[in-house]
C-alpha cells in the first residue's frame, strides 16, 4: 500500500507563515502526497510550488464553521479553482442539519458541487457535533448532491476522526464515494487503521512523521 497517496498534507492554521507553507510544499514534493490542503489565500502559491508534480492542491470552503451562505460558498469555490485548486473541502451548514432543514443542507452542498465543475468535492460533516443518525443523513445528502467524498472533521471543533465514524460513513455511502478521515491520525498504525475502516484519504499535518514511523505531536 502506498500510504503517501492517501494523505492530504495539511496546514490550515490561521497564523501559518509563508515559510511554513513552503516547507509543506517541499515535504509534499519529497513524499509525493495525494495533495496539500491549505487555506484559500495560499492556493495560487501552492499551485506554483507544486508545478511538475502530481500532488494536487486542496483548499477549504465555508471553513471552519460552515455558516456562510450557499452563494458565498459557491463564489469561494469558483475563485479557488481559478487560482489553481484541484480539490474543494467544504463544510456543511451544521445548524441547518441540526434544525432539520435537510433541503438547505442538500442545496448548500449542491451549490458547491455545481460551482466546482470537474473538480473533486469533499463534504466535511463535522462528525463530532452530530448524532449517528445525523451522520447517516448528511452522508446520504452529500451523495445525493453529487459530491465525491464525505469527510469527518475540520480539525477546528471538538474532535477529529474516529474509527467508528469512518466505518459508519463508509457503510452509509458504500463504494461509490470516498471517505476522508481528518484529525486523529498521529502514527502509521493510526493511518492504517483508518484505511482499514474505509478511509480513502487522510487529512493530517503529520504526514511526514506517519511515513517515517514516528509519533506526531498535535491532533490534526
Swiss-Prot record:
- Pfam families associated with the record: DeoC
**Which EC numbers does the record give?**
4.1.2.4
From the Swiss-Prot or TrEMBL record, state where the protein is found. Cytoplasm
UniProt pathway annotation: Carbohydrate degradation; 2-deoxy-D-ribose 1-phosphate degradation; D-glyceraldehyde 3-phosphate and acetaldehyde from 2-deoxy-alpha-D-ribose 1-phosphate: step 2/2
**Similarity remark:** Belongs to the DeoC/FbaB aldolase family. DeoC type 1 subfamily.
Keyword Cytoplasm tagged? yes
Which GO terms of the cellular component aspect does the record hold?
cytoplasm
A Gene Ontology biological process noted in the UniProt record is: deoxyribonucleotide catabolic process
Keywords assigned: Cytoplasm, Lyase, Schiff base
Describe the reaction catalysed, as an equation: 2-deoxy-D-ribose 5-phosphate = D-glyceraldehyde 3-phosphate + acetaldehyde
Record's function text: Catalyzes a reversible aldol reaction between acetaldehyde and D-glyceraldehyde 3-phosphate to generate 2-deoxy-D-ribose 5-phosphate.
- The molecule here is called Deoxyribose-phosphate aldolase
Q: Which Gene3D superfamilies match?
A: Aldolase class I
Q: Which residues form the active site?
A: 89, 151, 180
Q: Does the keyword Lyase apply?
A: yes
